[in-house]
């Protein structure tokens, strides 16, 4: 799957056309008010581009939360998003009470020029995801002919299709792969994601460094293996490191994370690294706690000293930070996925913060720095570094699957150039 050879919105002729656009308006709400409008703001350049270039209408579709294929307008309606979008765009937004069916089709058939229309939550229909469950917890499965009808109805709402929801690109949902129109383009958010991941996966600058944190080795096996075919250096940190250090150095790890399943392939991973001449750096010292709590008693440990029984490592220590800084300084391209410690608690945030500072420094010297979504993106928000790195991905699961070497259905479905 090529990331760089897909039709993009700037190459799509939208003049006089109805644009149906998949966006990610899955935003936090409290009492029917949007509490963080970041994702809505992020979609504005694509929406405005269509309007400025003479689109007849822009029909927006999104999911919100997990209604699991059941209509729950009291809890998961996108109606409050329409109000927020109206104030951000400075123009009226027509909200429709459903995303498919005759009323939606009629409203979108012949709209006044320059209309912006927001459809109700796609996931109120089990046909969007293909499966779900009812309020009593019984599993629901969509019938194939109904999925087809759902997709056909969505396809009637526009003349051209734009996908700007990278965060859902790893899901083969109806709105991602089932809108059957001749031209399907990526919006500007999606394009930025694909451009940056193409830089990493299709033609990387070197030395190329991957920094992998997070907890379980088993969850990251595919990621580590795929990246070992691409990078020159790798840092393995976070909770994942203890499984490696126990197997490779016979380190005493106390009550720190040990992943039995992951342990069985540590040697295979190291052999692959050696074969590919990839230099892997592990932590050498740690900040430890007598229990997994924010206000725990704090201590220090090294790989050599081991971690005392009952204690748990929750961050890497100052010597590790120095080692990592040297590795980062050598790189021309960095992909970072997963924090190095329990960064949510200040006592255990120093390792992740120190690394973030080094990555910001590297970026200012011309290194390309890509932050995978999820927790690592949260770190950027926490320390206000979103504008100080090259790219912060909006898709946790989607970016992880790309880095694992998987094909993303939502990208695959776009028109090829």
Swiss-Prot record:
The tissues in which it is expressed are: Testis specific.
Binding residue positions for AMP: 215-216, 220, 239, 313, 344
Recorded GO molecular functions are: ADP binding; ATP binding; metal ion binding; phosphoglycerate kinase activity
Q: Which CDD domains match?
A: Phosphoglycerate_kinase
Q: Where is the major localization of this protein? A: cytoplasm
Gene Ontology annotations for the cellular component aspect, listed alphabetically:
cytosol; sperm fibrous sheath
Q: Name one GO biological process term.
A: gluconeogenesis
Q: Which domain of life is it from?
A: Eukaryota
Q: InterPro entries per the record? A: Phosphoglycerate_kinase, Phosphoglycerate_kinase_CS, Phosphoglycerate_kinase_N, Phosphoglycerate_kinase_sf
- Per UniProt, Mg(2+) binds at 215, 218-219, 375
- Keywords of this protein's UniProt record, alphabetized? Acetylation, ATP-binding, Cytoplasm, Glycolysis, Kinase, Magnesium, Metal-binding, Nucleotide-binding, Phosphoprotein, Transferase
Q: Where does ATP bind?
A: 215, 220, 239, 313, 344, 375-376
Q: Which residues carry this modification: N6-acetyllysine?
A: 11, 75, 86, 97, 131, 146, 199, 267, 291
Pathway where it operates: Carbohydrate degradation; glycolysis; pyruvate from D-glyceraldehyde 3-phosphate: step 2/5
List ligand-binding residues for ADP.
214, 238, 343
- Which residues are noted in the entry as CDP-binding? 214, 219, 238, 338, 343
Where in this protein does the record say Phosphotyrosine is found?
A: 196
Consequence of changing residue 102 to P: In SNP-A; possible loss of CK2 phosphorylation site
HAMAP family cross-referenced by the UniProt entry: Phosphoglyc_kinase
What does this gene product do? Answer: Essential for sperm motility and male fertility but is not required for the completion of spermatogenesis.
UniProt protein name: Phosphoglycerate kinase 2
Protein's gene: PGK2
